[in-house]
Amino acid sequence: MRQIELIELEPIQSDVVYTPDDVAKSIVDWLQPSGICLDPCFGDGAFYKHLPNGSDWCEIKKGKNFFSYEKKVDWIIGNPPYSIFEEWLRHSFEIADEVAYIIPTNKVFQRQVIMKMINEYGGIKGIIIYGSGSTVGFPFGFSVGTFHFSKGHKGPTSLKLGNT
């Protein structure tokens, strides 16, 4: 495993986007995770409270930095910081077999390096497209989706139009 230099990052205000509880619940219900699950960006606990018992969490504001988390898990589910999405996704792929994030859709498709990383990991097993972020209670209007990345997945990608 590669070494990650831990640095103190000042929170970027645009990275603090809390997921409404009903949206988090609908995502967890769609995925039906089992085994060891991790919410890597706890925030207000919207995802964590819907994960199976025994799940773990990280939250930099509470002293649990996701980049220092090295235990293997079956699932990672959450709403990651957008400004460091590439690094966040890379670390997620190193420790989990199934990863699902609600994120602006351009974060997945805008850079070839991210698409290559996804392809090397496996693939996108499913996507829920919500349309504008404001439809799920986010403070912005660009397109948002939940992406389910699966290690070793080379099959089709299911697409769902979501409205929670």
Q: How would you label these PLM feature ranges?
A:
Residues 1-164:
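Class I S-adenosyl-L-methionine-dependent methyltransferase catalytic core
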